[in-house]
Amino acid sequence: MKTKITGRYIIGHVDGSPLVFMDGCVIYEEDTIIYVGSTYEEPVDLTIDAGNAIISPGFIDLDALCDIDHAILDAYPGPELAKGLEWSEAYFRGEREEIFTSEEEAFRRRYAFVQLIMNGVTTALPISGEYHKHWAETYDEFAQMAEIAAELGLRVYMGPSYRSGVMVTQANGEQTVLWDEALGTAGLHEAVRFVKQYDGKYGGLIKGLLAPARIQTCTTELLQ
């Protein structure tokens, strides 16, 4: 089926350079774009008038927030309040837990991915916070994310994070990093397993990525 989309601004290319076509159109058949430009005289099966809209290639977001609390935790608190959002030393040494269930994690990812697509992003490198994790992101969590991304048609470069330490706020209010290098090594192995099993999956929508957490929470050995 051949489809024609018309709009006020069409972002295309001519001789390798970007060009804006005013009141232009995009023609595609199945999954292939066959024309971008001002006019198209051949018959089509369906015409969609997008009106006063920008029709462009999908955007690429290499800092794609794929949760719904990241900005609240990372951007808005001042230095003093931010200390209260880090783990305590007691929590680090105690019974840590996953705050969100698997179903809640899936909702957060799906909601975030849909928001990316609604804002024109078709290729994303997801990032998210780790305050609420038992340690870092997991293989199972990212396998679920990959399925959601593929279902929505979003191209993603992804892999579970891994780290050998975590920022904590001590009883005196000072911040430091506490270490568990065994968890860092285990996380790296999980990340490698994800890349091996998911890179190129779902028709190439999933691209595997080794994504260590913040550099101050990784040992030199883990990064190497």
Predicted regions: what they are:
Residues 8, 26, 31, 52, ...:
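Divalent metal-coordination and catalytic microenvironments
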Residues 122-123, 155:
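Short acidic/polar active-site loop segments enriched in Thr and Asp
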